[in-house]
Amino acid sequence: FLKLTTCEAIQMHDLTPDEVPAIMEAAIPCGIITRGGGGDNPRNIQASPLTGVQPGEAFDVMPWAEAATEYLLSICRDIHMPRKLKVAFCNGVDDCVHTAFRDMGFVAQPDGTFKLYIAGGLGGGWRMGILAAESLPAEDVLYYIRGMITTFCQHGNYQNRAKARTRFMQETLGPDELRRVFLENVAAAKADESLKLHLTPAAITKTGTGTLDDPRAIAQKQPGLYAVAYHPIGGRLIPEKLVQLDNLLSTIPGCECRV
């Protein structure tokens, strides 16, 4: 079966050893590369599921989430963090990705910048993230991620895994000192000009007509277009359901499926 996770990833369970390489190879022509972070590495980056189509959003954060993903995957073998790192991007509407409870939470602002919370998290010793930046330039996102990794590697707990998440740096350093050290590392990271981003959200040119009244239908900011919510119980999907979804989506021009 397949499991849709809270970090917007898809897990495949109960596979045999022979099935794994076959699935990995078959996924390549579909644009799915089965590489990612696990263990003491970055986790899948979250973004508001309706970013780019949600009424009232500040802007579409998907390009920045994708750029952050590629950057973290490119360096994850070269860094040694105490524990995992969770990053989320919110489009500025309802914060369904809970940015204040992430190691890094970027919240889009109407002026094109981000508000940034750091060192938050649930679980044992939970902490609300501390506000590290009010108006972070969107082009500088990767510098802030690099700064957090450096800070985590410098001040994270390598001896006790139960206290090895970024939120515990609020205890060891204190919120104000953590913010100061973090911003100092961000400034140092800016020596690498290659991390500067120049991104533009993709334009949606598809149009629609008519209206749809259904409890699972969500009106997009594009007139006449809708998103449809489907929430499998416990996030579990049987393979047959994916086939049904694929058969349905293949009949709808310009649509996409998001986790």
Q: Which residues fall in each region the model found?
A:
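Peripheral terminal and linker regions in Fe-S/redox and tRNA-modifying enzymes
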Residues: 1-259
